[in-house]
């Protein structure tokens, strides 16, 4: 049945009721942005001070509220830390799944996710540091209820502590 209403007047099909499924429709980017359809979400979590001691692991855990794909991971701390190839921090994120038994590495296991002077980078006080995601797409997929372990591992003896570390994760939703 064609819409015979004047322009600007909404047309309502009496056959469409709550719970009706529409198929074959598409949403353009403007419609999606102006709608209430979730396209992504982010979460931040503060951890404990990263100590200077060797072999220390500093873990923070988050539970993912909805299914999605990790699209960005960032770190920020109050203190600066000089890059050093002997005394450095390595950042990692593991998806432990809903049972706690998962092992999927969500960050690349490369020097880019360290504070090494060769391949890594120093930490600037109160600045965001982008972390490099794993190149395997399947490792970035999360389900609602997945538990993620965000870890900062100290190698050597750091020049100073890094206080008020905050981790920010961004996810896209299909």
Label for each model-derived stretch:
Residues 34-174:
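Surface-exposed, low-hydrophobicity beta-strand/loop segments enriched in small/polar/acidic residues
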